[in-house]
Amino acid sequence: MEENNQAFHSGFVAIVGRPNVGKSTFLNYVIGQKVAIMSNVPQTTRNKIQGIYTTDREQIVFIDTPGIHKSHNKLGDFMVQSAMSSLNEVDAIMFMVNADEPRGAGDNYIIERLKKITDRPVYLVINKIDLVHPDELLPIVDSYKDAMDWTEVFPISALQGNNINELVTTLSQHMPEGPKYYPDDQVTDHPERFVVSELIREKVLQLTRQEVPHSVAVVIETMKSNDEGLVNIQATIIVDRSSQKGIVIGKGGKMLKEIGSRARVDIEHLLGSRVYLELWVKVSEGWRDKQGILQSFGYKKDEY
C-alpha cells in the first residue's frame, strides 16, 4: 500500500468589507458554529475573530475584521485600525460586498488600499445574491470588475450557502504548505469567555432599539463550573447613557430577561453544559472614547 505523502497546506485569510456585508454570517457558515456575532446593525464585529476551518488536507484560519467605516470616536479608530492591520498578516484576502447595493464611496475607499497589495491573491466576494435577480447582479459584478484586477470573483449567499464550497476550495488551493496551527476540533482562537460575551452582546443588538447597539459592551465578571456540571456566569452589559440602561432592562426587567434567555441557549450549545446566566446593566458614560476604559473592556490597541 502506498503512503499518502500529500503535503498539508495551511494559511490565513482576511475577510474585509464595509459594515454589514455578511462577513460574520459567511464565517459562521464555513466553520459550522457561531464564532462571530450576527446582527443587521453595522459595526457589529469589534475584534478580529479567528475562525478555523480544518480538513485532513488543509487548515484555513479566517480573520473576520471589523467593518471599515468613517470613524467618529476612539472605538471606531480601533475598529478601522484592526481591519487594515490584518491585511499584513495573511496569505489571501476576501473583499466582501453586497449584491443588493451599488458600489459606493466606502467600497472605493477599501479598493484603493487593496490595489497596493500585489503579492497576495485578492478575491472579490459578492454576497447576498439571494436578494437580487440574476439580471440585476450582472451590472454590480461589472462595476466591481472595472475597479481593479481581482484574482477571482465569487457571487455567493452566506445565508443560504450558495457557492461557498467553491470559494473555500479555491482558497485552499492558494494556501502554502505549512503546519496545522490548531487542533482538529478547535474552531476559534478566542477564549470561551470572549465568545460568551459576544453571544450576549449579539442578543442585545438583536433585541434593543437602534440607539443602543453601538454603545454596548459585555464584560464577563465570573464564569465557573460546579461539581454538578452547571456553569455559573455573571456578566455586566455596559451602556453609554442612563436612557440606554432603561431600554436594555425593559419594563419590569422583561427585556433583560429575554436577552439572558436567548443568550443562555447559545452559550449552552457552545459549552455543552447547562448554564445559569446572571446579567447586570451598568452605565459608563463616554466609554467608547476613553482609551483606558476601552482597554479594560478588552479592546487592546497594542495587540493589533
Swiss-Prot record:
It is a peripheral membrane protein. Residues 64-67 are annotated as: G3. Residues 43-47 are annotated as: G2. Residues 9-177 form the Era-type G domain. GO terms for molecular function: GTP binding; GTPase activity; ribosomal small subunit binding; small ribosomal subunit rRNA binding. Keywords: Cell membrane, Cytoplasm, GTP-binding, Membrane, Nucleotide-binding, Ribosome biogenesis, RNA-binding, rRNA-binding. Pfam families: KH_2, MMR_HSR1. This is GTPase Era.
